[in-house]
Regions:
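ABC ATPase NBD coupling module
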Residues: 55, 68-90, 114-122, 193, ...
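Conserved ABC nucleotide-binding domain
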Residues: 71-72, 131-149
Length: 246
């Protein structure tokens, strides 16, 4: 498995506080990876650096086989390269239907209002149907997004990211606020997607991560503390001390 993204000796400080400290880390393609760590460990800052929201003070972030330096790119340019990010709170158009939300997000150069009046092609219709099927919302295409359950809104936003054909998805705390059934369905969705994409999941819910069955990276004080299966890192004495609190 080749690396899709490599973070090489990256550091960043805020007002003297080193949020990321000489961090080196990578994810393969395709791969599902969970990132855990206590508050202030650097999880969000790492995601911000990958997506260009925060610029590193030093080090490199390299993308794909040709090692494109992401630290020299804008957020927009990074997104266009194939990196999509979903925050904890869903960002959807609640007054539009599920179908319209997906259409709006399709990879094209049309604006919001132009998209709503645009008569999309048969190929685009097929793509919308495929995405709806993937996120288990086919029967709800005509429903207003604001009327969906919390879990369904999360899936819709993932579908909106999928419409951009990303190679890497960054998913922030997907399990928060979900019912048990929704959490189980989300686990299956992420596992299915990881067969053809790389996915980074930042999550606090250990049961959710265990069900993902993927490699886990533990961050602490801006560096990698441990990596391996959830069972492996849970037995690491340093991890127990700084994260699990046992």
């Amino acid at each position: 498995m080749n690396d899709l993204l490599e973070v090489r000796n990256v550091s960043v400080s805020f007002d003297g506080f080193k949020a990321i400290n000489s961090l080196s880390w990578s994810i393969g393609y395709p791969e599902l990876r969970a990132i855990i760590g206590p508050n202030g460990a650097g999880k969000t800052t790492l995601m911000d650096i990958i997506t260009g929201k925060t610029k590193a003070d030093s080090g490199k972030v390299l993308w794909d086989e040709v090692a494109i330096p992401l630290t020299q790119k804008s957020e927009y340019q990074i997104a266009k390269l194939g990196i999509g990010r979903k925050f904890q709170r869903p960002t959807i158009f609640e007054e539009q239907s599920v179908e319209e939300n997906i259409i709006i997000s399709l990879k094209n150069n049309r604006g919001f209002f132009a998209t709503l009046t645009y008569k999309y092609t048969d190929q685009e219709k097929i793509r919308v149907g495929e995405i709806a099927s993937t996120i288990k919302l086919t029967s709800l295409l005509s429903k207003k997004a604001g009327e969906l359950s919390h879990g369904q809104k999360q899936w819709l936003e993932i579908g909106m990211l999928l419409s951009q054909d990303p190679k890497l998805l960054l998913i922030d705390e997907p399990a928060a606020g979900m019912t048990t059934k929704e959490r189980n369905m989300t686990v299956q969705l992420l596992r299915d997607l990881s067969k053809t994409k790389s996915i980074i999941v930042v999550e606090h819910d250990m049961d959710f991560i265990r069900n993902l069955g993927c490699r886990v990276t533990v961050l602490h004080e801006g560096s990698v503390l441990a990596e391996g299966s959830i069972d492996h890192v849970s037995k690491n004495k340093e991890v127990v001390e700084v994260y699990l609190g046992r």
